[in-house]
Amino acid sequence: MLAAAPKAPPPFNTQELSTPLLKPTEALKAVTVPKGFRVQLSAAEPMVRQPIDMAWDARGRLWVAECYTYAERETNFEKKLKDRIIILEDTNHDGVFDKRKIFWDGASQLTSI
């Protein structure tokens, strides 16, 4: 379940694309881990966009800083864009986040949680 929220702006890339963009499932297949380990896709767009920092709380929720602005004013800083802090939760404990809540969407030049 995704909480209703204002539509997020499209990401703005300040650099030329040097590698092809992969879908989350394709990127997951490209990850190599040691024998006995596995990786699992827990969240992807549109549930989370432009993540720059994450932190777990005591309840097992993942707090994510989404950055739509940039810390350097010279690099595409738009006053109308706002950064967000969202909370992702795995309510059925299957390892995949199924609940998203916007905690704060009024940040500007956010750099961490």
Task: Enumerate the predicted regions with their spans.
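Beta-propeller domains with acidic blade repeats across secreted/periplasmic ectodomains
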Residues: L2-I113
